[in-house]
Each structure stands twice: as structure tokens, then as C-alpha cells.
Amino acid sequence: MIILAIETSCDDTGIAVLEVHPVKSAKGGAPIKSGQFDWARKPNFKVLSNVVSSQIKIHQQYGGVFPMVATREHQKNLAPVLIKSLKEAKLLKAKKIINKIEDNKIEEIFKKEPELYKFTKKLLESYEKPEVDFIAVTYGPGLEPCLWTGVNFARALSYYWEIPIIPVNHIEAHILVNFMNHKTWNMKQVFPALSLIVSGGHTQLIFIENIGKYKIIGETRDDAAGECFDKAAKILGLEYPGGPQITALAAISQKNAEQTQNNAENSSFVPHKLPRPMMHSKDYDFSFSGLKTAVLYETRGKKLTKDYIANVCFEVQQAIIDVLLKKTIQAAKDYKVKTIILGGGVSANKELRKQFNYSLQTTNYKLNLLVPPANLSTDNGLMIAVAASFHKNKKVAWQKLSADANLRV
């Protein structure tokens, strides 16, 4: 089967095309039925395209994502990103004769997105229906106006092309994309598992009994980890998004510290002055707003030299990693899981990956670690397609699909 997937939960417009060959039973029998999984055999995923249009430069001037600005950009980007994605997948076929569309249903779908209606109408008039079996789309959680843009685009395509829709949970997609390149497909070796989802909008610990069976056991009570990176960076005068900026400067600080035998001699060094909020609480929840405030107090009245900023960045990053690592390992032990699964934009952080790897290699408690490729940690259409491939029995009629900004796994 071929899945066309759409992602617009925040500020990235992502569209991917994924070919998935049926999973056959371990004994070489008939394909596994929809909704069933044979982890002894790996499904054959073939990426036909994965196109992402980023809005980072647009939102840099605001120091963060403005939902209505992001929505406007999605309306501009969806049609051209779809065309590019289908072209890369070799599924784009121009019509020999352009047929003008006069369809009230399509216009009704886009009644709140007139610009997207204009672009979509032109697209449908100009190109043939692609040879895809399903349209998958993120319907939550995320920024509501952004979600609706992607959902309505998918609804219009589904209606006009008569292709069924598979709604996808954005958080579940961050989890399931790990299985695309996973070598071990024995369910007994993978589950139960624990997923740490860390991004600008979410910080959650999710217990996974099996695919489709999730329980959130901990989450942030205020700022998400990625949000803390961004806000700390803003205090330090760094550009949005703050995560990559802090990571780069933290690496410089670490290198400088290694070259300095006595850190006390380094007046700009910040020796564990920043707190690790809730690190030793008896639950699995997080809180990062206090860390952001601590950065504000630490830097107040200080001369923000390059070395000092780099050292604060190192401490901010390490404080966040310390909390994430401690909580995750403790929850993994308490719930007796076999695998830790990382996901979300912050999981692309090299130091976070490094310290998780080291911790799991040195702990007495044996755990598998699944981490997505860095380019699949951030939002993209491919992860939506992968998630949809596990839930093709959950297709819905286009009329019944709606966005849910507060959707839970």
C-alpha cells in the first residue's frame, strides 16, 4: 500500500509518501490482518518522498511560533509541498486538459481558509489523482489553527480523489517512527516499553504495553523541555530556536572546561548553580519554568561575555538532561520495561542521546534504547505515514474528521 501523509501540527509543513508492503506471518503464510502485528518479520518500508517546509526564519523575528502566522504559511505551502512530494515519489501526473472545478463542497471545506482553497482548487484542476491507497493526516495534538489547515487539506483531497483518510495522533507518530528502521522485531524483546517525548510543546513519559496501548505516567506541569531551551536562549540574547543555539555553545563550554584544569580559575564558569526542578520528586512529572527563572536571576547584572553565555548554556542543557534522564530511568525500572523510546524535537540533541546511551550501558538494569534519526526527531510527514501504516483499520470518512488540539495518546 502507498500512504500520502500530511503534518501541520506546529510550524513545519511536512508531506511524505511511503510504500508499505504487507507483513506476512513468520511461517510465510497470508499477510497479517489490519490491526495485527507480527514482530518476527519487519514490514518493508520504502520512502518515496519526505518533504518538509520549515518556517524557522519567519518566526525568528518573533522569538517563537505565532499560531496565526504559522497557519498562514501552511496555507501557502501545502499545495507546493504536495506537488514536490508527489513529484519525488514519481506519482505526479499533469492533466492533459485543465478542468475547472465548480464544487461547493470543496469551497465549504475551506470556508475559513480562502487562500488554501485557491491553491488547492488549482492543484486539483491541474493534476490527476495520484496512485495512493490512503491519506494520513495529523489531527492532534498541536496548535489548533495549524492542525485545521492540514486536516481540511486532507479532507478536500479525500473527497475529490475518493481516497480514505487515516487520522494520526502526533505523539504516537513520534513513537512509532522509531520502528521504521528497527532491526529487532520480536515483540517480547521490545514491550513493555517507555517513551520519553520531548519537544517544544510536550514533555511526557508514556508507558507502552503494546502499539495502541498507551498510558501517560508523567508530564510537565508547566514549560516543556524544548520551551525551556527557547526561553533560556532568549534571556541570553540567542536566536530562536534556542535548542540548537544552546547545544552548540554548550559544546564550546565543555571543550573549554576540559582544557582548564581548575574551573575555579575560570571566572565565567557556572558550577551547578542552576536547579534541577523536581528531579527527586516521587512522581514522574516535570517542571522547567523554575529553571528558566533561575537563568534570569543568574544572568541579571552579569556581563554577558561569549564564555559566560557558553557556560550558562552548558549548565542549562545539563540541568534539563539530568532531570529527563533521572526520571526516565527511574520510571523504566519501576514499570519493569524492556525498552526506552525517545521522540520529539529535543531528542535530536546529541548530548541527550550520548548520555542516555552511556547511562543504559553502565546501569545494572538492562534496557534497549530506540532513538529516531535526527531528521525524523523533528516534525515531518514520514512519521505520520509510518504511524498510519499500523492503523489502516482506523480510517474515517472525510466528513467526520476534525482537529483536536488537546488530543491524548
Task: For every predicted segment, state its role.
Residues Y159, V168-A193, A387:
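Conserved phosphate-binding catalytic cores of ATP/NTP-utilizing and phosphoryl-transfer enzymes
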Residues M1, V20-P43, K90-N104, E125-E128, ...:
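Intrinsic disorder/low-complexity segments
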Residues I2-H21, F37-V137, P141:
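N-terminal beta-alpha supersecondary unit
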Residues H174-L176, P372-V409:
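Glycine-rich phosphate-binding/hydrolytic loop that grips phosphoryl groups
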